[in-house]
Amino acid sequence: MAIERTLSIIKPDAVAKNVIGKIYQRFEDAGLKIIASKMVHLSEREAGQFYAVHKERPFFKDLVSFMISGPVMIQVLEGESAIATNRDLMGATDPKKADAGTIRADFAESIDANAVHGSDAPETAAVEIAFFFPGMNVYTR
């Protein structure tokens, strides 16, 4: 197994519910280290650029609107198979289909307000980390 890095975003719905600490605890309990983090309120331009891969999808406009509706917590996670571990912790995109005990099952409201984002592959993780943490001001600990 390899040490990986992945980007995680705690979305506006979960930030508003004040569950950042509970989600961070799940990351750490699963062996992931939080090696960079910041809270930001994304602009429409930033959210549009970050989710540009979905630009032609029917949900793009709603996704951008949701992501700018309040602050988000952005973090880089590091650990053994960090991408798969984080995706397992998050659960299915639709919280109604997410396994009990996953972040989305416990904290998400809907398929749109689904609490968290996580990179889906090493290549996207690298791009997403560089988007929010340019210059790789991210440190192993």
Curated annotation (Swiss-Prot):
UniProt keyword annotation of Transmembrane helix present: no
List ligand-binding residues for ATP.
K11, F59, R87, T93, R104, N114
> Which named protein is this?
Nucleoside diphosphate kinase
One GO process term, biological-process aspect: CTP biosynthetic process
Q: Which CDD domains match?
A: NDPk_I
Cellular component annotations (GO), alphabetically ordered: cytoplasm
Its annotated compartments are: Cytoplasm
Q: Which cofactor does it need?
A: Mg(2+)
Protein family according to the UniProt entry: Belongs to the NDK family.
Q: Which domain of life is it from?
A: Bacteria
Read off the Gene3D superfamilies from this record.
Answer: Nucleoside diphosphate kinase-like domain (3.30.70.141)
Cited function? Major role in the synthesis of nucleoside triphosphates other than ATP. The ATP gamma phosphate is transferred to the NDP beta phosphate via a ping-pong mechanism, using a phosphorylated active-site intermediate.
Matching entries from HAMAP family are given as:
NDP_kinase
Q: State the oligomer form and interacting partners.
A: Homotetramer.
| Catalytic site | H117 (pros-phosphohistidine intermediate)
List the GO molecular function terms: ATP binding; metal ion binding; nucleoside diphosphate kinase activity
Q: Which PANTHER family match?
A: NUCLEOSIDE DIPHOSPHATE KINASE, NUCLEOSIDE DIPHOSPHATE KINASE DDB_G0292928-RELATED
Question: What is this organism's lineage?
Answer: Bacteria, Pseudomonadati, Pseudomonadota, Betaproteobacteria, Rhodocyclales
Enzymatic class: transferase
Q: Report the catalytic activity.
A: a 2'-deoxyribonucleoside 5'-diphosphate + ATP = a 2'-deoxyribonucleoside 5'-triphosphate + ADP; a ribonucleoside 5'-diphosphate + ATP = a ribonucleoside 5'-triphosphate + ADP
Fetch the SUPFAM superfamilies from UniProt: Nucleoside diphosphate kinase, NDK
- Give the EC number(s) under which this enzyme is classified: 2.7.4.6
Its gene is: ndk
